[in-house]
Amino acid sequence: MAIILGVDPGSRITGYGVIQCQGRHQIYLGSGCIRTSSEELSGRLKQIFDGITEIIRQYQPDEFAIERVFMAKNADSALKLGQARGAAIVAATVANLPVAEYSATQIKSAVVGTGRAKKEQIQHMIQQLLKLPAAPQADAADALGVAVCHYHTRQSLIALSGRATARTYGRYR
């Protein structure tokens, strides 16, 4: 049984999602957004770091997964996004959590089945997969998607390592 914290980084809005893995089941624990208010980038990065640190304190995750960013609107946006990712990763590292990174295509494929999925499709599938009463807001849904992607990757690695058994993880041959 593991708790996974997924993060969708952003310099203004950083989404987070927390799921618990019990065998082949994923249980929703919480999600939301860290909305930064400071005009100064350094202030926003501190808010992201502090927010992720508080979420880690509250949920006590075992693993941390974050979206890998490879493209942005312009160079300045890419730098700010990279710094936001760094603030979140440092918070996880300070808490001694293993960090996994996934591309947007990997996340969309794990959640929807296609790497070209739209935000609405991700929101809908997250709602279905985690049996939520309503679709989560876009940034939180993306973060939950990161956590779900990590769960699926983790399950695949367990199966490939030969540690899976029919009783705990289904049939892998």
Curated annotation (Swiss-Prot):
InterPro entries: RNaseH-like_sf, RNaseH_sf, X-over_junc_endoDNase_Mg_BS, X-over_junc_endoDNase_RuvC. The lineage of its organism: Bacteria, Pseudomonadati, Pseudomonadota, Gammaproteobacteria, Alteromonadales. The gene is ruvC. It is an enzyme of class 3 (hydrolase). This is Crossover junction endodeoxyribonuclease RuvC. The RuvA-RuvB-RuvC complex processes Holliday junction (HJ) DNA during genetic recombination and DNA repair. Endonuclease that resolves HJ intermediates. Cleaves cruciform DNA by making single-stranded nicks across the HJ at symmetrical positions within the homologous arms, yielding a 5'-phosphate and a 3'-hydroxyl group; requires a central core of homology in the junction. The consensus cleavage sequence is 5'-(A/T)TT(C/G)-3'. Cleavage occurs on the 3'-side of the TT dinucleotide at the point of strand exchange. It comes from the Bacteria. CDD domains: RuvC. Keywords: Cytoplasm, DNA damage, DNA recombination, DNA repair, DNA-binding, Endonuclease, Hydrolase, Magnesium, Metal-binding, Nuclease. One of its GO terms (biological process) is DNA repair. PROSITE patterns: RUVC. Belongs to the RuvC family.
